[in-house]
């Protein structure tokens, strides 16, 4: 009697990792597409990323989502086999085992752009304010530029970090029609206002908003926080008080980046909509 083959194995690796919704998301994608898989949380010691990945691979693992604090180590692991998105992001959140080696991609920015499009944002020609200059901000620059944004202005509490990110982007990125500039938080204002403002800081985790000036938003502008929760984040509340027509949190970005990872691994593009609705309903019920 032939035993049934085990489903392919995937995981999300991080530290901490118990909070991750990735297993739930990928289980729903699996049910939706009919692609069986085993997906789990993988807690790695802070100084033990590579041994944990090696053990996962030796047990038959085929793909990893990578979260804090290992995205730079994942980049180094796959440095010879990076997608253009990962190279420009300087970080990897998706590892795929192919042809005897790990390949790295970054799906965070695609998840953001797809969610902005879902929300009805016209990114072609848009003026975008990007708050924060860390890895989350760097990871979304290329997809925003590829979507046709006319201008991306990076602001940060430490203005020099914003300037460094803008300069690094201009040096490394392919020529696009997107103007990338930088400044301090106090230099966030723009005549006529921004079409989209994106909070790429973790300030909302402390229920705080970045120290931004008022008058930031153009008519019908969207304020988007990469963080998410059962209630509007501090950044969303700040934006609404400043006149933003619409506000959204990052739950759709989370589901969108997972959908892109699923597509990379399985060659099938799942529908994020039902999964996003299920997670939102669960969040609201818990909140």
Curated annotation (Swiss-Prot):
Enzyme class: oxidoreductase
InterPro entries: Aminoacid_DH-like_N_sf, NAD(P)-bd_dom_sf, SDH_C, Shikimate_DH, Shikimate_DH-bd_N, Shikimate_DH_fam, Shikm_DH/Glu-tRNA_Rdtase
Reactions catalysed: shikimate + NADP(+) = 3-dehydroshikimate + NADPH + H(+)
NCBIfam families: aroE, PRK00258.1-2
Cellular component terms per the entry's GO annotation: cytosol
Protein name: Shikimate dehydrogenase (NADP(+))
Role this protein plays: Involved in the biosynthesis of the chorismate, which leads to the biosynthesis of aromatic amino acids. Catalyzes the reversible NADPH linked reduction of 3-dehydroshikimate (DHSA) to yield shikimate (SA).
Disulfide bond annotation, renumbered to this chain: none
The enzyme's E.C. designation: 1.1.1.25
Quaternary structure note: Homodimer.
Pathway, per record: Metabolic intermediate biosynthesis; chorismate biosynthesis; chorismate from D-erythrose 4-phosphate and phosphoenolpyruvate: step 4/7
UniProtKB keywords: Amino-acid biosynthesis, Aromatic amino acid biosynthesis, NADP, Oxidoreductase
Active site per the UniProt annotation: 71 (proton acceptor)
Chain positions recorded as shikimate binding sites: 20-22, 67, 93, 108, 228
CDD domains per the UniProt record, alphabetical: NAD_bind_Shikimate_DH
GO molecular function ontology, one term from the record: shikimate 3-dehydrogenase (NADP+) activity
Binding site for NADP(+): 84, 132-136, 156-161, 226, 250
One of the protein's GO biological processes: amino acid biosynthetic process
């Amino acid at each position: 009697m032939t035993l049934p083959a085990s489903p392919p194995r995937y995981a999300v690796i991080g530290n901490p990792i118990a909070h991750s919704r990735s297993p739930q998301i990928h289980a729903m994608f699996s049910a939706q597409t009919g692609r069986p898989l085993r997906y789990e949380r993988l807690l790695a010691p802070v100084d033990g990323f590579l041994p944990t990945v090696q053990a996962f691979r030796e047990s038959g693992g085929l793909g990893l989502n990578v979260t804090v604090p290992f995205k730079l180590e994942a980049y180094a692991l796959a440095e010879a086999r990076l997608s253009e998105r990962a190279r420009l992001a300087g970080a990897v959140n998706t590892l795929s085992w192919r042809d005897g080696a790990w390949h790295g991609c970054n799906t965070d920015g695609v998840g953001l752009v797809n969610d902005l499009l879902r929300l009805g944002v016209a990114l072609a020609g848009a003026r975008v304010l990007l708050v924060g200059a860390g890895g989350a901000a760097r990871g979304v620059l290329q997809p925003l530029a590829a979507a046709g944004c006319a201008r991306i202005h990076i602001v940060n509490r430490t203005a020099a970090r914003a300037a460094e990110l803008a300069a690094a982007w201009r040096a490394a990125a392919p020529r696009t029609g997107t103007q990338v500039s930088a400044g301090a938080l106090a230099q966030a204002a723009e005549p006529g206002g921004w079409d989209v403002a994106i909070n790429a800081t973790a300030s909302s985790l402390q229920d705080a908003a970045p120290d931004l000036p008022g008058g930031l938003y153009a008519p019908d502008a969207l304020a988007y926080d990469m963080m998410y929760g059962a209630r509007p984040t501090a950044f969303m509340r700040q934006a609404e008080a400043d006149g933003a027509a619409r506000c959204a949190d990052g739950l759709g970005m989370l589901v969108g980046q997972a959908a892109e990872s699923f597509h990379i691994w399985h060659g099938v593009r799942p529908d994020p909509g039902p999964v996003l609705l299920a997670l939102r309903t669960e969040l609201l019920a818990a909140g």
